Curated annotation (Swiss-Prot):
Gene3D superfamilies reported for this sequence: 2.30.30.30, Nucleic acid-binding proteins, Ribosomal protein L2, domain 3
Protein name per the record: Large ribosomal subunit protein uL2
NCBIfam families cross-referenced by the UniProt entry: rplB_bact
GO-annotated molecular function: rRNA binding; structural constituent of ribosome; transferase activity
Family as reported in the entry's similarity comment: Belongs to the universal ribosomal protein uL2 family.
UniProt region (Disordered), positions on chain: 34-54, 224-261
PROSITE patterns per UniProt: RIBOSOMAL_L2
InterPro entries for this protein: NA-bd_OB-fold (IPR012340), Rib_uL2_dom2 (IPR014722), Ribosomal_uL2 (IPR002171), Ribosomal_uL2_bac/org-type (IPR005880), Ribosomal_uL2_C (IPR022669), Ribosomal_uL2_CS (IPR022671), Ribosomal_uL2_dom3 (IPR014726), Ribosomal_uL2_RNA-bd_dom (IPR022666)
Self-association and partners: Part of the 50S ribosomal subunit. Forms a bridge to the 30S subunit in the 70S ribosome.
UniProt keyword terms in alphabetical order: Ribonucleoprotein, Ribosomal protein, RNA-binding, rRNA-binding
Cellular compartments per GO CC: large ribosomal subunit
Signal peptide: none
Lineage: Bacteria, Pseudomonadati, Pseudomonadota, Gammaproteobacteria, Pseudomonadales
Amino acid sequence: MAIVKCKPTSAGRRFVVKVVNQELHKGAPYAPLLEKKSKSGGRNNNGRITTRHIGGGHKQHYRLVDFRRNDKDGIPATVERVEYDPNRTAHIALLKYADGERRYIIAPKGVVAGDQLVAGNMAPIKPGNSLQLRNIPVGSTVHGIELKPGKGAQIARSAGASAQLIAREGAYVTLRLRSGEMRKVLAECRATLGEVSNSEHSLRSLGKAGAKRWRGVRPTVRGVAMNPVDHPHGGGEGRTSGGRHPVSPWGFPTKGAKTRANKRTDNMIVRRRK
């Protein structure tokens, strides 16, 4: 994998920094694991915008990724190829199991075509294998972590993400997340060893606004540039600073204000994120 800075042959190329991976599959994705993906433009069933800055972009197919891997315990799989996925920052790996079935998984870092992977509590400790947290050694790096047994991976799924298993006590293990948060998770939940691939994703630069539009991201307008009817920071004669602490268009504090309200799982958090 290489970081390539483009020559400034035009204004749109001047600031482009690309991540080039020669090992990625260059052909079409595996068709039986594709699904139609329709665009909402950020609107709900009433036609009202519920998520801003969404619209347009290139057509995409959704890749069906296996986040559970619990029905293939003990069945070895061979990595056929590692692919680009437009729906996520991580790469995905196409596995061919010994029973002939193919499935996509989130590609772990260092896993290449030809590698052998297996899921199950008797699986060896190597990147890409999926086990219950109770069977993973303390100090190991993991990703694709379940919060409820059998529900599928929910934590550490994006490019370069991982968590460290730092303690095991009774029915729970303690994980240190990349955010600095330490939380308890049931030891019977599954996780995949290693960290997620494409850790260089954060080093890329799209270089121009149009590249964002290709990805379906619309512009973000500053509140101080709006009218008073549109935003609490709007209005004023000439350029103004907003006149109050930064808030969202609906008046909620932004820029670092705590928004977590889920008291039901507070006892699972040993230490808050930084």
